[in-house]
Amino acid sequence: MSTKETVIDLFDRLFMEDVSDMMDEDLFDAGVLDSLGTVELIVEIESIFNIKVPISEFGREDWNTANKIIQGIEELQHA
C-alpha cells in the first residue's frame, strides 16, 4: 500500500473521514483534526511507518492537509 493509501485509510479508521477528495483541504478547519486527534495521528503514523515525528516538526501549518502529511512522512522516511 502506498503512503497516500495508508494515510487515507488511517483517517478513515481513526476519524471515520474519507479524505480522498479533500487532499489539499485544511483538516483542522474542516473539523477532521483537533489537538487530541493530532496526538492520535502522530502515534499511529510513528507505529505504521516506523518513524519518529518530532513535535517540533508537526506544526499545524506544516501538516494541515493530507498531502502535507504524506509529504512529511516521506521526508522523515528518507531522513
From Swiss-Prot:
4'-phosphopantetheine is transferred from CoA to a specific serine of apo-DCP. Residues 1-77 form the Carrier domain. InterPro entries: ACP-like_sf, DltC, PP-bd_ACP. The modification O-(pantetheine 4'-phosphoryl)serine is found at S35. GO terms for molecular function: D-alanyl carrier activity. It comes from the Bacteria. The keyword Phosphoprotein applies. One of its GO terms (cellular component) is cytoplasm. Pathway: Cell wall biogenesis; lipoteichoic acid biosynthesis. GO terms for biological process: cell wall organization; lipoteichoic acid biosynthetic process. Its main location: cytoplasm. Keywords: Cell wall biogenesis/degradation, Cytoplasm, Phosphopantetheine, Phosphoprotein. It is found in: Cytoplasm. It holds the Pfam family PP-binding. NCBIfam families: dltC, PRK05087.1. Belongs to the DltC family. Carrier protein involved in the D-alanylation of lipoteichoic acid (LTA). The loading of thioester-linked D-alanine onto DltC is catalyzed by D-alanine--D-alanyl carrier protein ligase DltA. The DltC-carried D-alanyl group is further transferred to cell membrane phosphatidylglycerol (PG) by forming an ester bond, probably catalyzed by DltD. D-alanylation of LTA plays an important role in modulating the properties of the cell wall in Gram-positive bacteria, influencing the net charge of the cell wall. This is D-alanyl carrier protein. The gene is dltC.
